[in-house]
Each structure stands twice: as C-alpha cells, then as structure tokens.
Amino acid sequence: MSAFWAEFMGTFLLLFVGNGVVSNVVLKQTKAAGDPGSWIMITTAWGLAVYIGVVVAGPYSGAHLNPAVSLALWLNGDLTAGQLGSYAFAQLLGAAAGTTLNYFFY
C-alpha cells in the first residue's frame, strides 16, 4: 500500500468510526440515544478509531492522520514538500469520504 492510500484509509476509518458512534449516541432515532453511559461509549470509540487508523496507516506512512501533524513534520524537516502535499490531500479526501459515508448511514 502506498503512503497516500494508507493516509486516506487511516483518516477515513478514524472519522467514519468516531463520528459513527457519536451519531449513534446523539441522534434520537437510534438505540443508544439517551443512554447515561453514552460519554463512555463515545470516548472509547474515538480511542479505538485512532488505534484502528494508526494500525492501518502506521507501517506505510507513519499514520499522521491529520494535516496539522504532517505540516509540523514538514516544518521540522522530516517530510518533503511533495510528501506534505500528498499526505494532506489524502487526509482531506479520507476525512471527507468517512464523514460523507457516515452522513448517508445516519
């Protein structure tokens, strides 16, 4: 897998899983709506979403999963300008795809 697709998939899964659980807990028509332990579900799911994203993207790209992280690494000299552009573009596309799919599910 290329670094571009690793960042895309990692960011996609991060946003899809994290926002999916928030949607499931917050939206009134779902089974988890109004559950007093909902904050535990949300925080645990976001932690797992980060873990899943890192496991998927880590071996191929370092699992930045955020354009701000990639920018900081570029400013530090750890990424080239081409890598920064590729990573940031993949992350933005992955975030948009994960959020859009979540929107259509809920």
Please name every model-derived segment.
Residues 1-106:
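Membrane-interface helix-loop junctions and terminal tails of multi-pass membrane proteins
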